[in-house]
């Protein structure tokens, strides 16, 4: 790849989930395209190919984990919202949107200790969370 594409790739890797979402919206508007997944046969063709490599390398240990907010009880929403804001550094509106749209990833590509710590904080606030 060229230096320009390498630089863009590195910048994309550093984006937060919220920033990536905003970038997708801007690209859709600027180029008149849609990032929606195709419905129908396209997904069926990709599934078998994606499953084969995972089965071929079962002994590779995972080093990056994603913490996913699975469920938010209505009576615990405020406490969970506070924890999500502390973990992600998001503003009130962004954190609220994230909490209300569960299941959603809260933290991606983090180490195992941090992922478990974040999961514990979310569960102590009353949420259901998982580490993937």
UniProtKB/Swiss-Prot annotation:
Pfam families attached to this UniProt entry: Ribosomal_L12, Ribosomal_L12_N
Biased composition regions of type Basic and acidic residues, renumbered to the chain: 102-126
Coiled coil: none
Key words, A-Z: Ribonucleoprotein, Ribosomal protein
Superkingdom in the source lineage: Bacteria
Stretches the record annotates as Disordered: 102-132
Ribosomal protein recorded as keyword: yes
GO CC aspect terms: cytosolic large ribosomal subunit
Function field: Forms part of the ribosomal stalk which helps the ribosome interact with GTP-bound translation factors. Is thus essential for accurate translation.
PANTHER family, per the entry: 39S RIBOSOMAL PROTEIN L12, LARGE RIBOSOMAL SUBUNIT PROTEIN BL12M
Protein name stated in the entry: Large ribosomal subunit protein bL12
Organism: Rippkaea orientalis (strain PCC 8801 / RF-1)
Highest classification ranks of the organism: Bacteria, Bacillati, Cyanobacteriota, Cyanophyceae, Oscillatoriophycideae
